[in-house]
């Protein structure tokens, strides 16, 4: 990675907005995005990413996706188990807190994914269009494994796998990502073109504004 590419990343509108948010928090500014607006922006970005991934997925075949999806699923199971063990042994955390930490490591940050995808796009780095589908795949097993660990070791021996899976797959982020994927995958091209002015063109601007708030939150914590 050359210096010009690094500079281009740090001077991108999204990163600059994040830095403005950090500075605003450090100087004790009253800059805040209302919770309802923050929630709306988050939902918009997740659905827009899913939509874009679904369109790319429609041009892929099953053979291209199978092994990456299998590897992603395996990582989603192995990572929280390793994180739990390290949190217990090295971090000296109790079972419930270690399981909560394991869920964070086993799951995935959609915001980080969006920023990475945005960087790859701006840097003209080739990447598979079905990566968004893998994001949805990775979101589920980490949460399921962590909830099962918390249930068994936290004293809830009667934990039901069906209930755990239901909680994981009905989460807001998973519904929005997979919903967007299905729309992008199944909708006709004319219909997608009709909504592109809402879910494609404004994406970069919405992401930049969203990261402004994330900068405030990150610096405040």
Regions found by a protein language model. Name each.
Residues 39-42, 48, 84:
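Metallocofactor- and cofactor-centric catalytic cores in central/energy metabolism, strongly enriched
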Residues 1-24, 35, 62-202, 206-214:
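Alpha-helical transmembrane segments of multi-pass small-molecule/ion transporters
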Residues 45-62:
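Active-site-flanking structural segment that lines cofactor/substrate pockets
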Residues 26-28, 32, 52, 193:
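Residue-level signal for pocket-adjacent positions within structured domains
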Residues 29-31, 35, 55, 91, ...:
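Juxtamembrane membrane-water interface segments of multi-pass membrane proteins
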Residues 50-55, 81-86, 214-220:
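Short, functional N-terminal and low-complexity linear motifs
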């Amino acid at each position: 990675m050359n210096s010009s590419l690094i500079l281009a990343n740090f001077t991108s509108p999204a990163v600059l907005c994040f830095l403005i948010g950090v500075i605003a928090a450090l100087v004790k500014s009253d800059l805040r995005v209302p919770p309802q607006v923050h929630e709306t922006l988050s939902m918009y970005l997740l659905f827009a990413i899913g939509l874009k991934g679904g369109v790319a997925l429609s041009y892929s075949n099953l053979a291209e996706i199978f092994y990456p999806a299998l590897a992603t699923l395996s990582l989603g199971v192995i990572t929280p188990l390793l994180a739990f063990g390290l949190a217990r042994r090295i971090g000296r955390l109790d079972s419930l807190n270690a399981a909560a930490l394991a869920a964070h490591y086993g799951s995935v940050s959609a915001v980080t994914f969006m920023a990475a995808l945005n960087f790859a796009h701006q840097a003209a780095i080739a990447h598979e269009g079905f990566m968004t589908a893998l994001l949805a795949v990775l979101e589920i097993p980490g949460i399921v494994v962590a909830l099962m660990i918390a249930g068994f070791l936290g004293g809830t021996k009667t934990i039901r796998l069906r209930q755990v899976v239901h909680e994981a797959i009905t989460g807001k982020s998973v519904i929005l990502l997979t919903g967007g994927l299905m729309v992008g995958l199944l909708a006709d091209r004319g219909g997608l073109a009709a909504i592109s002015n809402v879910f494609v063109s404004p994406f970069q601007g919405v992401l930049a504004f969203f990261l402004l708030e994330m900068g405030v939150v990150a610096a405040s914590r």
